[in-house]
């Protein structure tokens, strides 16, 4: 009877923990600098693992900047869609709904072409493994490490009480 109770508790715990491990992450583009000119967004993005369901949060002064979602060709040439397609609230949240490459630029003056205000990321499927492990400070790393430790403890408890 006690062993079936342990198995039930372990099963419920695994379900709850697996939902925590796949929780969406909000990425503040540029961290504390936000969406601004003269910032290296390539370097900012390189150690992050973006997954379907995550959100990009663009924080900026709406009187000075905007955000356009563009394709790779428009990204390379810093060409923009019509102005009415710009995101311009100053706190734009973009949910990453599909996997693949995503491109974002600022459409104000020369911010994209001369001031490097552009971002390209690769979005992975929800359960896809990361191409390489991110640094330990990354949100996904912390959750994954915690999940691994908790799972090891639960397996050890199950073996002891089985």
Curated annotation (Swiss-Prot):
Biological process terms in GO annotation: response to symbiotic fungus
Signal peptide: 1-23
UniProt keywords, alphabetically: Copper, Disulfide bond, Electron transport, Glycoprotein, Membrane, Metal-binding, Signal, Transmembrane, Transmembrane helix, Transport
UniProt-annotated binding residues for Cu cation: 65, 106, 111, 117
Disulfide bridge positions per record: 78-112
Single Gene Ontology MF annotation: metal ion binding
Membrane spanning residue stretches: 142-162
Gene3D superfamilies per the UniProt record, alphabetical: Cupredoxins - blue copper proteins
Compartment(s) where it occurs, according to its Swiss-Prot or TrEMBL record: Membrane
CDD domains, per database record: Phytocyanin
Glycosylation, residue list: 71
Phytocyanin domain span: 25-125
Pfam name, any one: Cu_bind_like
Predominant localisation class: membrane
Induction behaviour: Accumulates in roots, in a RAM1-dependent manner, during colonization by arbuscular mycorrhizal (AM) fungi (e.g. Glomus versiforme and G.intraradices); the expression level correlates tightly with AM development.
Membrane topology: Single-pass type I membrane protein
Domain of life: Eukaryota
Keyword Electron transport part of the UniProt annotation: yes
Single GO cellular component term: plasma membrane
InterPro entries recorded: Cupredoxin, Phytocyanin-like, Phytocyanin_dom
Protein name: Blue copper protein 1b
Name of the coding gene: BCP1B
């Amino acid at each position: 009877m006690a062993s079936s109770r342990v198995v039930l508790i372990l099963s419920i715990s695994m379900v709850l923990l697996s939902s925590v491990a796949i929780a969406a992450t909000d990425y503040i583009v540029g961290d504390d600098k936000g969406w601004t000119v003269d910032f290296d967004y390539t370097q900012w993005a390189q150690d992050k693992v973006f997954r379907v369901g995550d959100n990009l949060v663009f924080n900026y002064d709406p009187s000075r900047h905007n955000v356009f979602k563009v394709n790779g060709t428009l990204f390379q040439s810093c060409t923009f869609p019509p102005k009415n397609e710009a995101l311009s609230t100053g706190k734009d949240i973009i949910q990453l709904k599909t996997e693949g490459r995503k491109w974002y630029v600022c459409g104000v003056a020369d911010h994209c072409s001369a001031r490097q205000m552009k971002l390209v990321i690769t979005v992975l499927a929800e359960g896809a493994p990361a191409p390489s492990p991110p640094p330990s400070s990354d949100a996904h790393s912390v959750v994954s490490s915690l999940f691994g430790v908790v799972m090891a403890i639960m397996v050890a408890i199950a073996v002891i009480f089985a």
